[in-house]
Amino acid sequence: MSKLFEVLERLAATIETRKGGDPTSSYTAKLLNDPALAAKKLGEEAVETVIAAVAQGPDALASESADLLYHWLVLVAASDVSLDAVADKLAAREGTSGLAEKAARPS
């Protein structure tokens, strides 16, 4: 297993432990309590990741990617979507052309 997957698995487990936590003392609990805020933060991190990719170099991209993945995990948890559900969606798309997969989606 990749080091990234191991770290993400531990991080996802830690995020789950923050559900129901005190939002005044835990940033993660604050985001988990407010899915709209979690979504906003994910959007901000996505933009910062794109900027790092085109203008700031590999180290900045790695750092912003870490922030992006953290905020994505929080949003998924805040929305009560399991990582297995996401994995199922990805698995269903394996071996399908991206263009064919997009064309098959409902509008």
Swiss-Prot record:
It holds the Pfam family PRA-PH. Its main location: cytoplasm. Keywords: Amino-acid biosynthesis, ATP-binding, Cytoplasm, Histidine biosynthesis, Hydrolase, Nucleotide-binding. SUPFAM superfamilies: all-alpha NTP pyrophosphatases (SSF101386). One of its GO terms (biological process) is L-histidine biosynthetic process. It is found in: Cytoplasm. The keyword Cell membrane does not apply. GO terms for molecular function: ATP binding; phosphoribosyl-ATP diphosphatase activity. One of its GO terms (cellular component) is cytoplasm. Pathway: Amino-acid biosynthesis; L-histidine biosynthesis; L-histidine from 5-phospho-alpha-D-ribose 1-diphosphate: step 2/9. It catalyses: 1-(5-phospho-beta-D-ribosyl)-ATP + H2O = 1-(5-phospho-beta-D-ribosyl)-5'-AMP + diphosphate + H(+). The keyword Repeat does not apply. NCBIfam families: histidine_hisI, PRK00400.1-3, PRK00400.1-5. PANTHER family: HISTIDINE BIOSYNTHESIS BIFUNCTIONAL PROTEIN, HISTIDINE BIOSYNTHESIS BIFUNCTIONAL PROTEIN HIS7. Belongs to the PRA-PH family. This is Phosphoribosyl-ATP pyrophosphatase. It comes from Caulobacter sp. (strain K31).
